[in-house]
Amino acid sequence: MRKNTYAMRYVAGQPAERILPPRSFASIGQALPAGEPLSSEERIRILVWNIFKQQRAEWLSVLKNYGKDAHLVLLQEAQTTPELVQFATANYLAADQVPAFVLPQHPSGVMTLSAAHPVYCCPLREREPILRLAKSALVTVYPLPDTRLLMVVNVHAVNFSLGVDVYSKQLLPIGDQIAHHSGPVIMAGDFNAWSRPRMNALYRFAREMSLRQVRFTDDQRRRAFGRPLDFVFYRGLNVNEASVLVTRASDHNPLLVEFSPGKPEQ
């Protein structure tokens, strides 16, 4: 779906910018000069949340209370309403969205809000075979204080499909991106891993990419058929804290994770 795949970048005081997929992996970390690092602290805080197209009350309160202190906010089903765009541009240097499909007024898809400008941006889309609706993913790269580059993958996986062929197919280009990146990685989002074959495919992919799963002690993640849908995977970082915020502001609960970019745990 490369033809209709693009990202829209929202920056305060500037018109929205359309960004097309890069033509080669060689541009990872070379497309733009590294600017200010994502965090000046010895920690990176992220919020991961399927925001349910902002259909429920209190979604903005949750973002204001928990997103404003995060260096990265990875949203799925984010609809670019004026309220969300205003929050994003007022609190973050950049907000990149990959429209999965266009609703009557505003596009909906994954959206990554970041405290630094990405030096690389690659939008991805995959169409669900049954409903013919697209799901999107976004790969962005940010400089860290230790000069390493952090790759961030925001994923909303296909939901309605027979078997796992389309599910695994969506992971392939993500794997290509990660395989061409030597630095730390965070991959997170709504993976719709509601069946054992999907869960196995996701875990197999994580192993192949040398990604570890963030564990939540009080695990209040949204579940379907007894299996969690939202995940955070990582490599080259340490996990300091991980929690799940219970809220009625969406049909998913936000995940809050704090990483330190120091020497990764063994």
Swiss-Prot record:
Subcellular location: Cytoplasm
Keyword Cytoplasm tagged: yes
Alphabetized Gene3D superfamilies for the sequence: Endonuclease/exonuclease/phosphatase
Keywords per UniProt: Cytoplasm
GO CC annotation terms, alphabetical: cytoplasm
A Gene Ontology molecular function term of the record: catalytic activity
Family, per entry: Belongs to the UPF0294 family.
Protein name as it appears in the record: UPF0294 protein YafD
